[in-house]
Regions:
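N-terminal carbohydrate-binding accessory modules
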Residues: 7-70, 81, 96-100, 104
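N-terminal export leaders
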Residues: 1-3
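Alpha-helical scaffolding within the catalytic cores
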Residues: 23-28, 52-59, 90-93, 161, ...
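Short, solvent-exposed turn/loop segments enriched in Gly/Ser/Thr/Pro and often Arg
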Residues: 46-47, 72-75, 108-117, 172-181, ...
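Hydrophobic faces of well-ordered beta-strands that scaffold small-molecule active sites
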Residues: 38-42, 69-71, 105-108, 172-176, ...
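Glycine-rich anion/phosphate-binding loops
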Residues: 50-54, 85-89, 152-156
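Polysaccharide-binding and catalytic clefts of secreted carbohydrate-active enzymes
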Residues: 132-299, 303-315
């Protein structure tokens, strides 16, 4: 489930990784006047409730002092129930009701939850664990960032959303995906294997350079061609994988995530009003997350859960507010 509140990360901040690159996006007050920096918002999922309840709920939210709401991040199956057949009338009504009661809307792209027909028709879009098991439809974040086919379907649905709501007066901004990160699961699908080899070739240029950097003369690991390289996996080797390969794996994953988010930001920019901002909400403990690489949004946000997250490795109170 999504968090109650997204808090913009003030910028610029300095990247603390070894990369000689700074993190700099638009100042937060460019999109939010100072008096609105701590506005209270809430996600609302109209697709989960009988439509007769929507007006009651949104009216009560407004009366409670909530200023904005998020829509649509998990609703791809409602928007495109069949391939190429779109239904936005229900979302039009939800946006109109929010506007009626003075609630601003953050529109979200529904890319963490592709519809069942898509993975049924094209199982090659699914991510795969290192034991060879593909992650199936039924929850979320099961489609591969490395799948060109999946990205084409993402482009279609994001373009449709942007063209429909990119100039709506109630829509103040856009959230790309939701907590992108595959829960830290590494994708070992054939799409990811191929993209990893391309990434390595672009980084190192020659296989000799890769061998030298990875220290592959140890244990006769030396490669003669990039096609021989696979994503490092504990399942495929009797001992721990090459640590240099693991480092490149993490960097590759971060680039794939960033490329997926940046691609959507570019699509949105082509259609939305210049006053509508673009963000995504991150979970920092997911391995692929590197905010430095996500640089096509206006700012980044960090999901904080009010009473959970104590077991996520960032301190006993790491996810709590205050």
């Amino acid at each position: 489930s999504a968090a109650l509140i997204d808090i913009p990360i003030p910028g610029p901040i300095t990247n603390t990784s070894l990369q000689l690159k700074s993190f700099s996006q638009s100042p937060v007050d460019k999109s939010f006047p100072p008096e609105e920096l701590f506005a209270l918002g809430s996600y609302y999922y109209p697709e989960q409730w009988d439509s007769s309840q929507w007006e009651r709920d949104l009216k009560k939210m407004s009366e409670m002092g909530i200023k904005f709401t998020h829509f649509a991040e998990f609703a791809w199956a409602m928007m495109e129930p069949e391939e190429g057949k779109y239904d936005f009338e229900w979302l039009d009504r939800a946006v109109s009701l929010a506007e009626k009661y003075g609630l601003k809307v953050i529109m979200c792209t529904p890319t963490p939850t592709p519809p069942a027909w898509l993975s049924k028709k094209y199982p090659d879009i699914l991510i795969q664990r290192d034991n060879g098991v593909s992650i199936q439809h039924g929850r979320r974040q099961h489609a591969s960032w490395s799948s060109d086919r999946y990205r084409r379907y993402v482009e279609n649905i994001v373009s449709c959303l942007a063209m429909r709501y990119g100039n709506h007066p109630a829509v103040i901004g856009w959230q790309i995906d939701n907590e992108p990160g595959h829960y830290g699961v590494v994708d070992y699908s054939e799409n990811a294997q191929l993209k990893f080899r391309v990434w390595l070739q672009k980084k190192y240029g020659t296989i000799d350079k890769l061998n030298d950097t990875w220290g592959t003369s140890f244990w006769s690991e030396t490669y003669q061609d990039f096609d021989q390289v696979r994503l490092p996996s504990q399942q495929e080797v009797p001992d721990k994988p090459n640590p240099h390969a693991m480092l490149d794996l993490n960097r590759f994953m971060a680039d794939e995530l960033a490329g997926f988010v940046n691609m959507q930001a570019d699509i949105l920019r082509r259609h939305i009003h210049k006053d509508q901002w673009i963000t995504t909400n991150l979970i920092p403990v997911f391995n692929p997350v590197d905010p430095v690489r996500i640089d096509h949004t206006d700012f980044l946000t960090y999901t904080r859960y009010l009473v959970t997250g104590h077991n996520q490795g960032i301190g006993s109170q790491g996810f709590r507010m205050g």
